[in-house]
Amino acid sequence: MPRTTPAPGHPARGARTALRTTRRRAATLVVGATVVLPAQAATTLKEAADGAGRDFGFALDPNRLSEAQYKAIADSEFNLVVAENAMKWDATEPSQNSFSFGAGDRVASYAADTGKELYGHTLVWHSQLPDWAKNLNGSAFESAMVNHVTKVADHFEGKVASWDVVNEAFADGDGPPQDSAFQQKLGNGYIETAFRAARAADPTAKLCINDYNVEGINAKSNSLYDLVKDFKARGVPLDCVGFQSHLIVGQVPGDFRQNLQRFADLGVDVRITELDIRMRTPSDATKLATQAADYKKVVQACMQVTRCQGVTVWGITDKYSWVPDVFPGEGAALVWDASYAKKPAYAAVMEAFGASPTPTPTTPTPTPTTPTPTPTSGPAGCQVLWGVNQWNTGFTANVTVKNTSSAPVDGWTLTFSFPSGQQVTQAWSSTVTQSGSAVTVRNAPWNGSIPAGGTAQFGFNGSHTGTNAAPTAFSLNGTPCTVG
């Protein structure tokens, strides 16, 4: 519950608000006084972000701070930190009304000790929900949710500047509500209930809703947009929207900035909250260059929207990235590689913030004794980029077809076969038919023309039985495509 006086170790609410806005006010005032250091003087991404008046954050596992290279980068390159797992429900309330804040407090202490803004993640999420909570129903479940939100937000009051109050409320495809325990037991109203409880517990923290696959303008982001618009119209306390941005190399939505702007126009802040850009491994110079360009696009999209607060990457090093465990054969998604070497994305982010990186001598990576595998080959004409988000026995595929020939394609059919018995259950921006493992995808009425060098995109939901290997061969209008 709200306190009338701050508890020991908590600054007064007004003091916390002033501290939270210091960086952006300082950036504005210093520029106004014309004494700001030139952008070229930035030697770290933190300095570049500070100079741009934006956050640049990372997801922290406090157990890794004992690793010298990890801590050195964490200390110097970021001005915001978010707990990767330490503030989620299973970590903070493993049994009913028995709270455990040890790991979360370590993250909060680290933020305070290093002068970083602390971002809270997450109060209500259907994943990592303890079994005891899943077994509750009706009013008991709602009371447990409100109690959890209240106790956790109250504990970190004065330390957390912003909270992901509700995470991943919408499903993929047409953007219906996520079929979660919260939705099943409490219906649509649970989101509003959670936000009102969070505001009551901490009246000055910014309250955010956070989701994935909403970076472009699509059915899912439209559902999120409609909810935010409704909340703002009715005075529900929602201050910001987080765009997770777990992206795939070469597939940054072209309307990312426009999407951020339309949410900002509703009167909320926006931020990029969990950025990583994965590729098929092993990496190579071409993939890393494309990844760098993609990181730059994402940061530039934020920089072009006044109410975009900043960018957070979901980890520091590829060594500890979540990606390979969830997407076998993919990875290399972060700004530092598994040996803590800066990748080309580092300089790209620096430039997007408006600074120029300071060159640092590097030792060339030894040439591997085993040649890098060559991507699946085919005649110059088409390329397919295959991206998947998967869970238990389901998945969502997002597919980009690129016309690499010198002539336009007018009407297209893409064919491939599933290697592991997968089944398509729902498709969009296309017409999909399946016979056994063979899948045929035909264009929708609006995306049948692909100019030379242009792309068409479609997606579908599917089911699998535990193995979800990606197709290895595609043909467009009978011509084999490369896979990249």
Curated annotation (Swiss-Prot):
EC number: 3.2.1.91, 3.2.1.8
Residue stretches in coiled coil: none
Listed GO MF terms: cellulose 1,4-beta-cellobiosidase activity; endo-1,4-beta-xylanase activity; polysaccharide binding
A Pfam entry, by short name: Glyco_hydro_10
InterPro entries noted in UniProt: CBD2 (IPR001919), CBM2/CBM3_carb-bd_dom_sf (IPR008965), CBM2_carb-bd_dom_sf (IPR012291), CBM2_CS (IPR018366), GH10 (IPR044846), GH10_AS (IPR031158), GH10_dom (IPR001000), Glycoside_hydrolase_SF (IPR017853)
Matching PROSITE patterns: CBM2, CBM2_A, GH10_1, GH10_2
Region (Disordered) residue spans: 357-377
Stretch forming the signal peptide: 1-41
Keywords from the named record: Carbohydrate metabolism, Cellulose degradation, Disulfide bond, Glycosidase, Hydrolase, Multifunctional enzyme, Polysaccharide degradation, Repeat, Signal, Xylan degradation
Enzyme class: hydrolase
Catalytic residues (positions): E168, E274
GH10 domain sequence ranges: 42-352
Keyword field contains Disulfide bond: yes
Region (Linker ('hinge') (Pro-Thr box)), start-end ranges: 357-376
Biological processes per GO annotation: cellulose catabolic process; xylan catabolic process
Other known facts: The linker region (also termed 'hinge') may be a potential site for proteolysis.
Cited function: Hydrolyzes both cellulose and xylan. Also has weak endoglucanase activity.
PANTHER family, A to Z: BETA-XYLANASE, GLYCOSYL HYDROLASE
Listed name of the protein: Exoglucanase/xylanase
